[in-house]
């Protein structure tokens, strides 16, 4: 028996072009690697000595953007901005955690607060969270957003929709279309990002509320905590969801076993769904999301408690039936909003994933090939800001907001 160690592309060429490969030849395929890599960007000591499940799952080689790019602060007068949606004419619709939506125009001027939004519970991590425009926004002007809503025995993540008035001063007919289960007396881990799929259904991330009593519900299919859900524009479970006909599960659930997912986006070329979530102390994750899959929290994790205590007895990082993250960070990235880049403005960034980092104070650029991370870069790290969301504009520019109230615009020089 002969062993041939090849890259996947070389092996494919051989198989297609040669009929003389000896029998009983074993191909050992090496993963695709990004050219022109440098040392990994993470140089700090990890919180744990846990080993990755496969090569390239963490601390991948670094990359550096060759194209000259520039950035500017459009405004520093926002108040705890959380989510960004791109309107026409260079305008951005931005949520502020305390409960307001505002429009920032191309000159960086900020509108008055848009009237008509429901009240939010803005304590700690709660408030007005992510937002997304209806795929037919140009004709129906409908906006969807997530927020923390107070209830009788605590609060919960909710989803609302409304119609932005033509004068852009009010949200008309605003109404709540979905409320997560298990209202809880806490103020952490709400999730709160939204994205539409190609069929016009809405995917929403929901956190597990952090506490020991609620984190286990990430594994409970009768609870919406620690889940990614998929609903219609009216807040009903999408008809072809994986648990649509399962009486022992909530029909809106799409995937489960999540901790606090604050980033979600579709790959622009292959249509795959990706999500990023906060781990505990270490173990922030980037996951490839598939229906009915279990992403493991709190059973498996690459992190530890903030106290330094291990999670689980014994602690484990892998278990049959639970998905491994495509990539994880230790120390943490604190991943919030994220977007895949089209390549319109800076071609070398095409299909790269950009993730806003909070405690890490940078934007992570990830190069992804064949659903594997093959390169990582840190952008705007010298700004020392807590980046909360990042989106692509209509002309290939990137916009990002920070907890301190800044709105940045990143463009090709």
Predicted regions and their residues:
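Surface-exposed loop and turn segments in beta-propeller and other repeat-based domains
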Residues: 112-126, 174-190, 233-254, 298-330
């Amino acid at each position: 028996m002969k062993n041939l160690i090849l890259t996947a592309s070389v092996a494919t060429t051989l198989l297609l072009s040669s009929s003389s490969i000896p029998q009983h030849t074993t191909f050992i395929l090496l993963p695709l690697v990004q050219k022109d890599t440098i040392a990994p960007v993470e140089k700090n000591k990890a919180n744990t000595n846990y080993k990755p499940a496969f090569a390239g799952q963490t601390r991948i080689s670094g990359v550096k953007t060759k194209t000259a790019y520039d950035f500017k602060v459009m405004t520093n007068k926002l108040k705890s901005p959380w989510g960004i949606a791109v309107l026409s004419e260079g305008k951005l619709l931005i949520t502020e955690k305390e409960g307001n939506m505002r429009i920032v125009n191309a000159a960086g001027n900020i509108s008055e607060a848009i009237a008509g939004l429901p009240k939010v519970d803005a304590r700690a991590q709660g408030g007005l969270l992510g937002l997304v425009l209806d795929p037919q926004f140009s004709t129906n002007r409908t906006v969807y957003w997530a927020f923390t809503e107070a209830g009788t025995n605590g609060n919960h993540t909710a989803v609302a929709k409304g119609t932005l008035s033509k004068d852009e001063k009010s949200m008309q007919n605003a109404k709540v279309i979905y409320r997560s289960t298990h209202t809880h007396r806490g103020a952490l881990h709400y999730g709160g990002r939204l994205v539409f799929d190609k069929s016009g259904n809405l995917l929403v991330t929901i956190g597990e509320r952090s506490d020991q009593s609620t984190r286990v519900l990430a594994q409970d299919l009768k609870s919406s905590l620690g889940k990614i859900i998929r609903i219609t524009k009216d807040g009903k479970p999408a008809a072809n969801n994986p648990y649509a006909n399962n009486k022992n599960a909530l029909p809106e659930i799409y995937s489960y076993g999540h901790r606090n997912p604050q980033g979600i986006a579709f790959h622009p070329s292959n249509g795959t769904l990706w999500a990023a979530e906060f781990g505990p102390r270490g173990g922030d994750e980037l996951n490839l999301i598939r229906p009915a899959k279990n992403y493991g929290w709190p059973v498996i994790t690459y992190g530890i408690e903030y106290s330094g205590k291990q999670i689980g007895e014994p602690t484990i990082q892998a278990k049959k039936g639970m998905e491994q993250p495509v990539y994880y960070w230790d120390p943490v990235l604190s991943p919030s909003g994220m977007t895949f880049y089209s390549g319109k403005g800076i071609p070398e960034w095409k299909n790269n994933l950009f993730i806003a980092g909070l405690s890490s104070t940078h934007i992570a650029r990830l190069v992804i090939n064949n659903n594997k991370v093959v390169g990582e870069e840190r952008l705007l790290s010298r700004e020392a800001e807590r980046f909360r969301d990042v989106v692509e504009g209509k002309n290939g520019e990137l916009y990002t907001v920070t907890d301190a109230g800044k709105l940045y615009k990143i463009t090709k020089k």
